[in-house]
């Protein structure tokens, strides 16, 4: 097992010993082997959705824990294939993307329609597929930071996918159209029995104020999570909160002083717990993103993110660039270290 405390370094006590005095854990719907029977059984999803959610939970190294380790590789569209795969050209071949997820013991591999369709007959029965339906691409100039549908729900279903995903840029000029598109797509996905995952990202230049990037503030990302759950996301993917007070800084929208005085603190675990509270207290699962590849600190950064997510009550990590920009062996090692956090019974809910 990974030496988690050593990787956390000076943050070990602050993260591993923290007691949450904001939102009590007994008010949350926490991950567990019985999550589908205990939590999802209340909702209106068809039985096939529950079956496919259980399929996700029963796959990989985290099988039976209620936690998820997902490999996302859609950056070939979002960030360009060259920028994404030049470090490891083998990942230009979709086969190796799926092999990385299998070798690392992930619950699921998430990628574009094209990537997964090109190898679906060989792999769809070996590891659950999550097809990302929409993307932003950086070939159009100037970049409008919009999300365009690249595939239909039916295309994902026909290749054997158990889940679909999409991004909405909440706060952007295009967000209301995106909300309508993805709400309809998620409705259709549920009709076909697929799990729905929303990348609930913020996007507006006004969210950067006085040198602080409030795209990762707990209050604003929390509201994005609430909107994601509103349109039927079974799982919400969100960037880990790094600050708070976005509403106050941009002086727009509605908030309450108790969000900052009672429901959050400066501890990152409490900030992520507020993100989870906005996922209907965990009725929609919260997975945090692993972030960009940063070099020597990737392993410690990924483990830190996993510890915060788990102790806050989150459902897991969706980590891509930190893994696939390394050799396959090192990528597997990094993903396994993250999984070790969720397998470690000594790392408890705060």
Curated annotation (Swiss-Prot):
Database matches in InterPro entries: Aldolase_TIM (IPR013785), DeoC/FbaB/LacD_aldolase (IPR002915), DeoC/FbaB_aldolase (IPR050456), FbaB-like (IPR041720)
Q: Known consequence of changing residue 237 to A?
A: Loss of activity
Q: Which residues form the active site?
A: 237 (schiff-base intermediate with dihydroxyacetone-p)
- The yes or no answer to whether the keyword Acetylation is present is yes
Where does it localize? Cytoplasm
Pfam families listed in its UniProt record: DeoC (PF01791)
Does the entry feature the keyword Acetylation, yes or no? yes
Briefly describe activity regulation. Activated by citrate.
Q: Name one GO cellular component term.
A: membrane
Q: Give the primary localization class.
A: cytoplasm
What is one process in the GO biological process aspect for this record?
Answer: glycolytic process
Record-level Gene Ontology MF annotations: fructose-bisphosphate aldolase activity; identical protein binding
Which catalytic reaction applies to this protein?
beta-D-fructose 1,6-bisphosphate = D-glyceraldehyde 3-phosphate + dihydroxyacetone phosphate
This enzyme's EC code(s): 4.1.2.13
* Function statement: Catalyzes the reversible aldol condensation/cleavage reaction between glyceraldehyde 3-phosphate and dihydroxyacetone phosphate (DHAP) to yield fructose-bisphosphate (FBP).
How is this protein organized at the quaternary level?
Homooctamer or homodecamer.
> What family is this protein classified in?
Belongs to the DeoC/FbaB aldolase family. FbaB subfamily.
Can you name this protein? Fructose-bisphosphate aldolase class 1
From which source organism is this entry? Answer: Escherichia coli (strain K12)
């Amino acid at each position: 097992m990974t030496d988690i405390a050593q990787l956390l370094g000076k943050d070990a006590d602050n993260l591993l010993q923290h007691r949450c005095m904001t939102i009590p854990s007994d008010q949350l719907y926490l991950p567990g082997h019985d999550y589908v029977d205990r939590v999802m059984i209340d909702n209106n999803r068809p039985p096939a959705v529950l079956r496919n959610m259980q399929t996700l939970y029963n796959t990989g190294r985290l099988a039976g824990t209620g936690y998820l380790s997902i490999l996302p590789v859609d950056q070939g569209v979002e960030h360009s294939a060259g920028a994404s795969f030049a470090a490891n050209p083998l990942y230009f071949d979709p086969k190796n993307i799926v092999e990385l997820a299998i070798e690392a013991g992930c619950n699921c591999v998430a990628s574009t329609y094209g990537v997964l369709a090109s190898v679906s007959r060989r792999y769809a029965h070996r590891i659950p597929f999550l097809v990302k339906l929409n993307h932003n691409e950086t070939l159009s100039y100037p970049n409008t930071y919009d999300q365009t549908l690249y595939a239909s729900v039916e295309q994902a279903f026909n290749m054997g996918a158990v889940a679909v995903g999409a991004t909405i840029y909440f706060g952007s000029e295009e967000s209301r159209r995106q909300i309508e598109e993805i709400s309809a797509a998620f409705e259709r996905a549920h009709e076909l029995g697929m799990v729905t995952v929303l990348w609930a990202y913020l996007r507006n230049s006004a969210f950067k104020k006085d040198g602080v990037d409030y795209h990762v503030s707990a209050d604003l990302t929390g509201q994005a999570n609430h909107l994601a759950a509103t349109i039927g996301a079974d799982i919400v993917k969100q960037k880990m909160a790094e600050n708070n007070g976005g509403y106050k800084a941009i002086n727009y929208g509605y908030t309450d002083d108790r969000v900052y005085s009672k429901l959050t603190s400066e501890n990152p675990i409490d900030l992520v717990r507020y993100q989870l509270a906005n996922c209907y207290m965990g009725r929609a699962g919260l997975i945090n993103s692993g972030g960009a590849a940063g070099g020597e600190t990737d392993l410690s950064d990924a483990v830190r993110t996993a510890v915060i997510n788990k102790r806050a009550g989150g459902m897991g990590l969706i980590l891509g660039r930190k893994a696939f920009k390394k050799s396959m062996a090192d990528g597997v090692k990094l993903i396994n270290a993250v999984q070790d956090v969720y397998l470690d019974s000594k790392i408890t809910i705060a």
